[in-house]
Amino acid sequence: MGYNFDRSISRRNTNAMAEEGFANYLFGADAPALALEMPREELISMWVADMQFAAPDAAIDAITERLKHPIFGYTADLDEQLYQAFHSWCAQRYSWHFAREEMQVSLGVIPALFALVEYVCRPGDKVLSLTPAYGYFKHAALQRDREFVTSRMLASDDGKYSIDFEDFEAKVSDPAVKLFFLCHPHNPTGRIWTSDELRRMGELCIANGVKIVSDEIHCDLLRTGNAHTPLAKLFPGSPDIITCMAVSKTFNLAGMMIATVIIPDPELRSEWKRRHYPFVNPLSLTAAIGAYRDGAPWLDALRLYLDENFALTQHFLSDHLPKAKFRVPEATYLAWIDLRTYFDDSVNLTRFFLEKSGVVLEGGEMFVENGDRRVRLNLACPRAQLRLSLERIRDAIVKQYH
């Protein structure tokens, strides 16, 4: 079956964050007015991590069928359908198994992060993460009155990131650290952590009484030839590991607001059930079941298309911005590009590229720390859009600095 990922789909007038909600998110309500050098309707959204592709028919058809039933009352994950579809997905793709009672449902991974900080940590406890980091790791800790501490990753000359285990061990040994947010695969760098890296992080956390929330939301979006190993698979039955996955990134269903959270610890699971909002959108539940049951062919085709988008990006940067450092990520649809040779620390790259090129992207300052003068570019878009964005980025750099 063919899939048309080259199709351009306008999202204007759909209340899409990607096109209509970026200003407050990226700059805040009190930021100075933007000095755009082109009309707002010509801006290109390359920032937030959802796709510019139509969701798979597997999800759309499931929603369409559910719409034939005219009642949309309170709904929860009460039967076996989601578990069977999701467990089968994980078993086939990752040889990973978990019991029905361990699987909980959340209104997205972000709400799960906020909840788990509160359920695991007391006020004043510390939450650890690797940086650069997904910003909501920090937000989840600070907005629940927990301290957020970091371990900076190391970047090699060719752009590959690794864990500074000496620093990580020192941080995780702090008795006040009670929770570690692991991003696996990693956003924004695209690393898939190896089994050795995962075991070492897991062993250090468990030895120090630190629970791990493994955010594996990007796990299905691998480059060809790569494989993902769920952290929990390496520590069977461990009560110290909570795994978050979702259809949102995999099948472009982020707005459906549904995620699965695997909680092996009976005590923590009881706390989750006692305090967590149990309902889900009936269309979201149906979409997730349909996607996991029948969405694999679409995903396989998508991954090949993304491989080609990354190859295009690598060749373009090599030819037109040779001082940029870029390594094709092992997973995700996000390009993490090092532009330190073109900019100094005084430039806010998010604002610069929006104003000078009309490309809405996220500068490294959006990723807590350790991302200075880098940008994250979302490549889950039609190839023509990607090519135009890269050309605009190149032209803005050349015009401003050379």
Task: Identify the role of each PLM range.
Residues 144, 207-208, 357, 400:
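Helix C-cap/helix->beta junction micro-motif
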Residues 4, 10-108, 115, 293-294, ...:
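N-terminal small-domain helix-loop-helix segment of the aminotransferase-like
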Residues 71-203, 220-224, 228-234, 238, ...:
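Conserved core of the PLP fold type I
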Residues 306-314, 326-339:
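Conserved glycine-rich beta-strand-loop-beta hairpin in the small C-terminal domain of fold type I
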Residues 237-307, 314-315, 397:
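Conserved core segment of the aminotransferase class I/II
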Residues 352-361, 367-402:
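PLP-dependent enzyme catalytic core of the Aspartate aminotransferase-like
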